[in-house]
Amino acid sequence: MPILAMTIPIPPGKTPALEQHLAEARNHPDIDETFKGFGISRETWHVQETEQGDLLMLVFDADDPFTMLQEFSRSNNDLPVWQRQCIKEILGVDLSQAPPAPPSRLIFDWP
C-alpha cells in the first residue's frame, strides 16, 4: 500500500491544542467512515520534540495518498471541514490549498 509522510512545524505552545484536537477527532462518530471513504487504511501522527521546536510527523497508508489529500481538501463532510479548520488554527496550515512543499521523498525502505 502506498505511504505518504509529511512533517509540519508546530508553532510554539500549540502542541497541547493539537493533542486535544486529536483526542476529540479520535472519538468523532464519522472517523471510520470518513477515513475508509478516502481510502486510508492507517493514519498516524507523531510529535518529535527538537531544540528548534516541536515537529508533527504524519504518515498515511492509503490507496492513493495524493488523491486522498485532494479529496480531503475539497470535502464538505463534517469531519474533514472541522479537521481543516482546526489544523489551520493550530498549525497555520490551510489544508484546503495545495501543500506548501513538495511531497517527501522515500530514501530508505526495508525489507
Regions found by a protein language model. Give the residues of each.
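Amphipathic repeat-derived elements
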Residues: 21-33, 42-46
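Short, well-ordered beta-strand segments in beta-rich or mixed alpha/beta enzyme
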Residues: 5-9, 43-74
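An amphipathic, aromatic/His-enriched active-site/gating alpha helix that lines ligand/cofactor pockets
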Residues: 30-41, 62-99
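Short, low-order "capping/linker" segments at domain edges
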Residues: 94-111
